[in-house]
Regions:
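Polybasic, lysine/arginine-rich low-complexity segments
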Residues: 2, 26-27
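Bacterial N-terminal signal peptides that target proteins for export
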Residues: 2-13
């Protein structure tokens, strides 16, 4: 009888242990968010914030207002309202790089999906500090930090062995930019720019920049007409 009891207990215990291991080893479900156009993005936790791990592709604001698609250089540089485009006016760049937006689109405060927003300068600084940047450097402009840019860059796609580690999960791709002064497209593979929602002045919007030949992160103000990429951050609860 004792032998039977012991065998019965073992038969109960072993499946229980396997179940516990399965539960403890189960990966967390990925975080996703869907925009007004139905594009779904992966997101990641960086520090205490949840960031999109991809560039925004939306062609409408979250109230369903259309954003104007502008291929023309002359129209782009005369902007006084929200514009967007694809790099080199090639829609095949949408899937990988997302859309380039001027700062007028950012300032609508409706560019990101509901419950998300374009990160402020302070929120970008919080990201950078979570990767080891000092407060003094985070508060500065120009090239700042040590290897935070490398941690933000993707592992592929950067020129001349300039790939990052993507240790942050930000996965910054080298998507280039659209210049606000002539409307031209430049430097895909070498640089990428992201708007913040914060203005440096009435005519300049603050942004972040990553370069193939830099491990730091660049912060400065730029013409509001410039075409830069956008990430979204989840609203705090």
């Amino acid at each position: 009888m004792k032998i039977i009891t012991r065998i019965s207990l073992i038969n109960l215990i072993i499946p229980g242990l396997i179940l516990i291991q399965m539960v403890s080893c189960k990966k967390e479900d990925p975080i996703t968010v869907t925009d007004i156009d139905g594009n779904t993005y992966y997101a990641t936790t960086i520090g205490n914030q949840i960031w999109m791990a991809e560039n925004l592709k939306a062609t409408r604001l979250n109230d369903k207002t259309s954003i104007t698609l502008v291929p023309s250089n002359s129209t782009w540089i005369s902007a006084t309202k929200p514009f967007y485009c694809w790099f080199s006016n090639d829609t095949s760049n949408k899937a990988l790089y997302g859309a380039l937006y001027n700062n007028f689109a950012v300032q609508t405060e409706k560019l990101c999906p509901s419950g998300w927003h374009v990160p402020s300068n302070d929120e970008f600084k919080a990201l950078e500090k979570s990767l080891g940047m000092s407060q003094v450097e985070a508060d500065s402009l120009g090239w700042r930090g040590t290897d935070q840019g490398k941690k933000m860059k993707s592992r592929t796609g950067w020129n001349n062995n300039g790939n990052g580690t993507n240790k942050s999960g930000f996965n910054g791709l080298a998507g280039g930019y659209r210049y606000g002064m002539d409307g031209g497209f430049y430097d895909r593979g070498a640089v990428s720019f992201w708007w913040t929602s914060t203005k440096k002045s009435a005519t300049l919007g603050l942004y972040r920049r990553l370069d193939y030949n830099q491990n730091q992160v660049y912060a400065e103000g730029s013409n509001l007409k410039g075409g830069k990429y956008v990430r979204c951050v989840k609203d705090s609860i």
